[in-house]
Amino acid sequence: MTKKELALIEQYAKSLVEVAIEKDFLNALKEDVYAILETMKASNLDKILSSLAYAPDDKANLVRLLKDSSSVYVNNFLDVVLQNQREYLLFDMLKTVLKEIAQETNTYDVTVTSAIPLTEEQKNRVISVVMSKFGIQTGRLIETIDASIIGGFIISVNNQVIDTSIKRQLHDFKMKLI
C-alpha cells in the first residue's frame, strides 16, 4: 500500500469518526462498522473489492448492498467512497474507523490466546488486569484457542502484549542455555 493510499484511508476514517462525534453517533457507528466488516470477511468482499478481476460497476453494486443495513451516516460515507472510486480501500478504511473510535473513547478490543477455553471468571479477571495494567477501557474480548502455547495465555491490546505462555517461557529458558 502506498503512502498516498494510507493517507486517504486515514482521512476518510477520521472524517467519518468526526461526523459521528459531532452527531453523537459513535456507538452506533462502531456497531455498523463491526457488522459491515464481518459481512465483508464472511463473503470475501474485501478481496473482491481489491481485485482487478472484477469490473468497477460490479464492485460498486456490491458496496451498495452494504447500505441496506447501515445508518444514514454510514450510507453517506459509502456513497462518497463510491463517487471517488475508492472501494478497493473500503475494508482498510473501516478497520481504521474502529482504531480511531478506540483512540477517541480509550476503549480497545482485547485479544486473549490460550491453550484451552477460558471460563467466565477467567475472562473477567483478564478484563480487570487489562484495565488496571494499561489504564484503558475494554471493548470486546476476543478469545483465540491455540494449543501450541501449551499453557498460560497471551493478552494483546492496543499494540501491547502480555505473554505468559509456557511456549515462550520454554523458548526463553532455551535461549539462556545456549
Swiss-Prot record:
It comes from the Bacteria. One of its GO terms (molecular function) is proton-transporting ATP synthase activity, rotational mechanism. It is a peripheral membrane protein. It holds the Pfam family OSCP. Its main location: membrane. One of its GO terms (cellular component) is plasma membrane. It is found in: Cell membrane. Keywords: ATP synthesis, Cell membrane, CF(1), Hydrogen ion transport, Ion transport, Membrane, Transport. InterPro entries: ATP_synth_OSCP/delta_N_sf, ATPase_OSCP/dsu. Gene3D superfamilies: N-terminal domain of the delta subunit of the F1F0-ATP synthase. F(1)F(0) ATP synthase produces ATP from ADP in the presence of a proton or sodium gradient. F-type ATPases consist of two structural domains, F(1) containing the extramembraneous catalytic core and F(0) containing the membrane proton channel, linked together by a central stalk and a peripheral stalk. During catalysis, ATP synthesis in the catalytic domain of F(1) is coupled via a rotary mechanism of the central stalk subunits to proton translocation. Belongs to the ATPase delta chain family. F-type ATPases have 2 components, F(1) - the catalytic core - and F(0) - the membrane proton channel. F(1) has five subunits: alpha(3), beta(3), gamma(1), delta(1), epsilon(1). F(0) has three main subunits: a(1), b(2) and c(10-14). The alpha and beta chains form an alternating ring which encloses part of the gamma chain. F(1) is attached to F(0) by a central stalk formed by the gamma and epsilon chains, while a peripheral stalk is formed by the delta and b chains. PANTHER family: ATP SYNTHASE DELTA CHAIN (PTHR11910). This is ATP synthase subunit delta. It comes from Streptococcus uberis (strain ATCC BAA-854 / 0140J).
